[in-house]
Amino acid sequence: CALLTHFKLSQLTQQGSMPANPVVVTTEVTTGILTRIARHFGVQIVNNLLVGFKYHADVIWQLESTGRYEDVTGTPDDLILASEESHGIMAMPGVRDKDSAVAVLLLAELALTCKRQGRTVVDYLNDLSRQFGYFKNGLENLVMTGIEGKQNMARMLDGLRANPPKAIAGMAVASFEDLRDESGRMGPFKGDTDKAARNFLIFRVAGPNGIAGKVCLRPSGTEPKAKAYVEVSGPPRPVTMTDDAWSKQIAEIDGMAAALGKEFVASAMAFAK
């Protein structure tokens, strides 16, 4: 999604055909590099949706109905690209769900452009990391089957909700957000389905040298497990940084992401017992 978002924005910029109020749409658990890319191009971004393309489609519907979604303004034609972490892409407002056909066409155009420039798609992705910072994303599955598993999962989420950790893997928890908090940004529940979807916890952590991380935890909507989405990111590469130093920073971020996921799962499972 980072590749296609940047590619489409760069092409529209080069062609002088950017819409009047361009907007990128994504979820809370999708890579944060999208936010940096959108801000680089000066476009609006919705980056805090729940998981599921019905939420992306709702943004388009709100723009269509009222011309606004929260602080974002525009029309459906202003959509640049909507995405989620499972590689779903929506790039046309008329198709309000995952659209693999358009995603393949965009990727093919990107690959052709890279080939003409003597580069590969991997080169393009590495360039994004250098320009916007390296992001390491991972997923931890906490499988809990049967009635007992469902009860354990509820205990785990309620335990973390009541007693959020102060630090994870040596990184201080800078903020904690419970999307079931009706005094928070999502407001009162709209119904039972909304309440279930908002069983979602967000832990943001701060590391050294501009490195930051995030863990999001939610029950799966289709399988007997909880999902912990882990992200650790660093700053853009300074022009004076050597290749060795850059490689070392990437390895450091990879290691921090692995440790963050491992320790978070251990602390979460302690509440499930």
For each of these PLM feature ranges, what is it?
Residues C1-Q11:
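Catalytic or ion-translocation cores adjacent to nucleophile or general acid/base/metal-coordination motifs
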